[in-house]
């Protein structure tokens, strides 16, 4: 669907006839969908697609979240935010946590939470534990500073996978036990023993006092319990200069014989592709123009847009762009590719076919690498149901 009202969307697909389904019939069909049905469809679709691997070995999965403004409902306390200077009437939000395959340009899983109940830590652990990956597959989970926690590290390690997560100076200093003041480059392996007890007498390895880190009872750590009072974890702490005078801390468990500083810089920049994917599902795929008020239906729309995104991305990636002597390298215009793929999916009955790849290849745009822009934080109210054709 696009940004029109439901009735117009139905006319667009079925034709402007008296036989077109009604709005009530459409919503009755939505009610028949079982919880988890669209997730199963996403996973089944992804299994049929080939994977692009980093260094021919690792699948790169970026994990991040994005807020989505939904229909205003002050009675839903789990999604409603009180009025403020930017929103005098208040607003409601859902929160989309997603795993995104960077090299394949497709979403692999979602955890959708109500705005006020959002918890990126638990969502990350859930996606890692339920990841639909092959038995011998190797995955690198990449995430921003908000995901740096011992519990997240442990979940990836216990699932036999790898992670590369940005971290603040304060958190890294807590792990290392020393200041980063004046440190411009760092690549250090550390062993840490996590425990909820602050008593030195209860330690199983008192001779390794500098290895111990206390985990508060208020902080989730799923691998500590009354039976298992200590958890040992091995980390690699890296500090790289991304641009002149700009340093980033990365915490990982990647082997040093395969990944050096240049590899980490490359991976760091690749992670931002997920931000583009969130933009694509909100604007070219019209997720900002929701068609539902009920939260359950909003979730269905999110899953549906993500499945459509993966379908469009797979076709766009495999469309060859003619090579010419130009100032810039060119790539497929994804916004146009979405419109073309959507028109293709509407073909049914006796309608003629269309040259999807040819149309996509004729709509291209220049690739301008290295450009950066400051993020503009501004509130945008969701598109009202009253202002659609």
Task: Tell what function each PLM region has.
Residues 44:
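Solvent-exposed, charged/polar functional surfaces in cytosolic regulatory/catalytic domains
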Residues 59-61:
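Conserved beta-strand elements of the Class I
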Residues 81-85:
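Conserved mixed alpha/beta core segments that line enzyme active sites in large multi-domain catalysts
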Residues 1-4, 12, 21, 25-33, ...:
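Single, function-defining residue in the core of a domain
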Residues 9-16:
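Short alpha-helical "recognition helix" segments of helix-turn-helix
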Residues 47:
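Glycine/small-residue-rich loop that forms an oxyanion/phosphate-binding "nest" at active or ligand-binding sites
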């Amino acid at each position: 669907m696009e940004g029109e009202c439901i009735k117009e969307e139905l006319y667009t697909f079925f034709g402007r006839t008296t036989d077109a389904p009604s709005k009530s019939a459409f919503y009755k069909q939505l009610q028949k969908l079982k919880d988890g049905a669209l997730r199963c469809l996403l996973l089944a679709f992804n299994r049929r697609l080939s994977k692009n691997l980093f260094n021919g070995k690792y699948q790169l999965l970026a994990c991040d979240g994005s807020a989505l403004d939904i229909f205003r409902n002050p009675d839903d306390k789990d999604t409603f935010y009180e009025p403020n200077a930017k929103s005098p009437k208040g607003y409601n939000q859902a929160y989309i946590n997603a795993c995104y395959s960077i090299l394949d340009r497709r979403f692999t899983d979602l955890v959708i939470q109500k705005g006020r109940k959002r918890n990126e830590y638990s969502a990350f652990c859930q996606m890692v534990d339920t990841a639909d990956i092959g038995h011998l597959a190797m995955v690198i989970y990449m995430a921003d500073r908000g995901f740096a926690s011992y519990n997240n590290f442990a979940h990836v390690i216990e699932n036999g996978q790898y992670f590369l997560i940005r971290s603040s100076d304060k958190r890294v200093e807590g792990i290392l036990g020393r200041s980063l003041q004046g440190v411009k480059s760092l690549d250090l392996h550390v062993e840490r023993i996590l425990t909820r007890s602050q008593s030195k007498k209860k330690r199983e390895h008192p001779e390794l006092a500098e290895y111990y880190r206390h985990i508060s009872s208020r902080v989730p750590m799923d691998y500590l319990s009354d039976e298992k009072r200590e958890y040992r974890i091995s980390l690699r702490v890296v500090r790289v200069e991304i641009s002149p005078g700009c340093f980033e801390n990365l915490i990982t468990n990647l082997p040093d014989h395969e990944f050096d500083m240049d590899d980490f810089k490359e991976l760091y920049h690749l992670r931002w592709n997920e931000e583009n994917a969130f933009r694509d599902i909100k604007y070219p795929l019209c997720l900002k123009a929701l068609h539902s008020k009920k939260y359950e239906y909003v979730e269905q729309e999110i899953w549906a847009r993500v499945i459509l995104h993966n379908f469009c991305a797979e076709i766009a990636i495999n469309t060859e762009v003619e090579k010419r002597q130009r100032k810039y390298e060119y790539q497929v215009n994804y916004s146009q590719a979405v419109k073309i793929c959507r028109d293709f999916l509407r073909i049914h009955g006796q309608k003629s076919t269309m040259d999807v790849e040819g149309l996509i290849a004729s709509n291209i745009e220049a690739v301008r690498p290295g450009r950066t822009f400051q993020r503009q934080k501004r509130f945008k109210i969701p598109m009202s149901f009253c202002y659609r054709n």
